[in-house]
């Protein structure tokens, strides 16, 4: 039995389900089968019973226990139950009614299968007797009914295949009676049926046949020899035929079991009784018990074990020593009593008997191990109770034949990574026996912890103007998980800071959590910003958490105060006060803005230089007031240097020159009190708004009326200034193409064209030649006086520039009102056309005073500001007398970045667009500032190359355009944005707008040194011109707007004193390039007098002073004549002239 129970002690894998699965499978096989006989397919039957078997695993079953491992076994891979050798049931189970082999196997899915194989008996053995002959002696005194037990036949087969009956040779004296023992075996007794008479017959011979229950039955025979002896009248007699006795299993040897006593009334040897085991008493029983033949005491001779056998039957006979003794028989049944002599046995079924691993995410009720506890004792001695020792998050759940260890709480590896479990089992016997089994449970890690920041809110303070890449702070998050589950990486959550991604402000090291600044912060733009940092682990799926980081930017004194009031021009403000101002009179209010905060942005005011004795300034509000009174003897102007400085640790300041002029005294009522500046400001704004509104309505109505005549724009060259002028004179945009390509060739055509010239064109002509109220020689020009002709190649390095027409200054002109030649316009010869007088087209003429420039560069400039070309670069160098604020404005100009919006836009609608040149009503206001800037600015320019394209076709023209006419797309620019390509293929447009002079208008010029020449003053002798130089001049006259500011006149007068500018109305400009590789270009600023003045001075050549006379007087004379004309033309500008100026500008 011990060998059969040893496999139960094997340890197996952990059961995965919450309750262990257990099934019972029963099979049967007949004995005497050869080795390898397949009993059953356990895998198939287990799968049908609900087992989850993994076909991918090589080993599906494992035997836990096997009561006959030498006879049967299970194939672990196929699950077939097979025999290992020939099974002899008669030898294995002897006479047991059932012969069963038990196996317990566990599948790969941790499920238990109990298999019982019943060995079916075959009738393969015949009954046999222990001896070949049975000899009996029967006293003749034996009365009928006397029973004499016979030796039983033995049949190894069991059940119905064992001995079932006995047969005796038929006779009249003796018979057989069949009886059954307690173990089911049958035996026969010989019964005397009639009285015997030794004298009649003393010897009998019979045959006894034993039959089993087979079909056909097997049989065994034995001879029976009966000898009739003389009688012993009394036989021993037992008190009872059956005795029952019990003995503890732990009884030592020689322990008495029972004392038998059989009485015999005879005397002597006939009454002396002898005891012995008789009949069928197996050898094992004879090993355990013995009987004293004289006393009849039955004692224990071997070790009793209740678990091995708990009932034994002893057949005892007693006979006297007399002759013809007839023995007496009795049966003693010995019951072995169970004692608590076996402690419980604990078997742990898991993957590893010493170490069990379970995930910390295992839910309550999860099975981690299977426990089987056994006790060989019976009853209360074998009733076992199990429990887990200690306070652990596990519990033991008991079932009928096994127990499971379940998770009974939340497991947390971070708090407790392993447990030592002890299982204790105890029985209920007396004394109580117990046993214990210990093993280790290791908790495996799961990604169940989020990264945890050391604090949810971080704040860092950094000064503005920090270095990009500067370290700000570090964030830290901890994850108590292990391995990748505990590795933390950082990233910034996408967000916006001032409409910009936060990634443009800061970055984070994903491993260390260090945060760095990606830009230099500006407190004035961003005082503080927040963003979130995300920390996530490396588990699957990853867990994450975030923290908020706030960056506070401290202000530093990095902004210089900017004086905003009074308005400054080149750092100078002019203020007018009445001469009769009293003490405390408010002269002006100085205002300065500082974008810093706190003390860094608090501005105070002071006067550092100038006439401080006459004025004082309030340091807080910047009010400049008088400290003295003024009279008629006071000087007309005063100067103050006003300084605005902040209160930062390193104070920054800005200064301005305030020029205070004394104006005529105010009336008494006007001089009382200070002027209400707010009221004046409101009235001025209202007036300007009203004027602008009326102007817009007038322009809209006018444009709408003009556009209703025809709404097609088929001229690809109308984007140039020259073409716009020609189209404007004709008054019809649709015929712009004809204004370039068509010119009358006959006087009849000239007259028809001259009749069509509108009043607008006449006013333009009048304005272009000057306007005189009282002159009777006023000469008008018609459309026939203006013709666009191809410019000669040798003059491509010269450009006539239209002069300015307004005296008003504005610093914003350079920023927003620069004219450009549309880059999309085709560079054809029509781009380089001159306006030519039809009447003097073939006559010899000379230049009138005009702006010209000479260049040796390969290209022409892209930008023209009031007729003066600017270089392509956006950064300029200025002379020392040019103020820094002007340079700042030009460098920061947005005009160079958006030329398309101001130069190329034409919507094609009836009304002008807001960015069209016709819509810009303030363009003339910026002229003088531009002229002054040009007079003080040095720039460089590139030359141009003459393209070879057809003058009437645009970039988008096709062959159909020559037949059907041009469409809107023909004049559209090729590139929407101007590029600054310096390739030779990218040619520029230069507009030369000239009007030929008549022969009477030819001017004289004089040499200035051996190499330089400039135009002579009015009234010089025409004969002074050398004949060989006349053809070079081409006789063209610039259509210039001749109204300029007094500053320009003074500059011209100063320039006229030198040899470089002999003419009083010309002044050379030298524009210097910031790039040393480009050649410098010389410009000549010219003011054209009216045509009749030219004739007047040309005809009065005899009365002119000689060349040796001083030229200053001649200059003054001309200027006296020119200035009234210029003033008169400025006072009586017509709307057409204004529009012409807008177009030209």
Swiss-Prot record:
It comes from the Eukaryota. The keyword Signal applies. Residues 22-129, 130-238, 239-346, 350-453, 454-563, 569-672 form the Cadherin domain. Ca(2+) 11 binds at residues 360, 414, 445-446, 448, 481. Keywords: Calcium, Cell adhesion, Cell membrane, Disulfide bond, Glycoprotein, Membrane, Metal-binding, Repeat, Signal, Transmembrane, Transmembrane helix. Residues 22-678 are extracellular. Ca(2+) 8 binds at residues 249, 307, 338, 341, 377. Ca(2+) 1 binds at residues 31-32, 88, 90, 124. Ca(2+) 9 binds at residues 340, 342, 375, 377, 381, 427. Ca(2+) 6 binds at residues 232, 234, 264, 266, 270. The keyword Membrane applies. Ca(2+) 2 binds at residues 31, 90, 121, 124, 157. Ca(2+) 7 binds at residues 249, 305, 307, 341-342. GO terms for biological process: homophilic cell adhesion via plasma membrane adhesion molecules. GO terms for molecular function: calcium ion binding. Ca(2+) 4 binds at residues 140, 199, 233. Residues 700-1145 are cytoplasmic. It is a single-pass type I membrane protein. It is found in: Cell membrane. Residues 901-921, 1094-1145 are annotated as: Disordered. Ca(2+) 5 binds at residues 140, 199, 230-231, 233, 266. Its main location: membrane. Homodimer; antiparallel. This is Protocadherin-19. It comes from Mus musculus (Mouse). The lineage of its organism: Eukaryota, Metazoa, Chordata, Craniata, Vertebrata. The gene is Pcdh19.
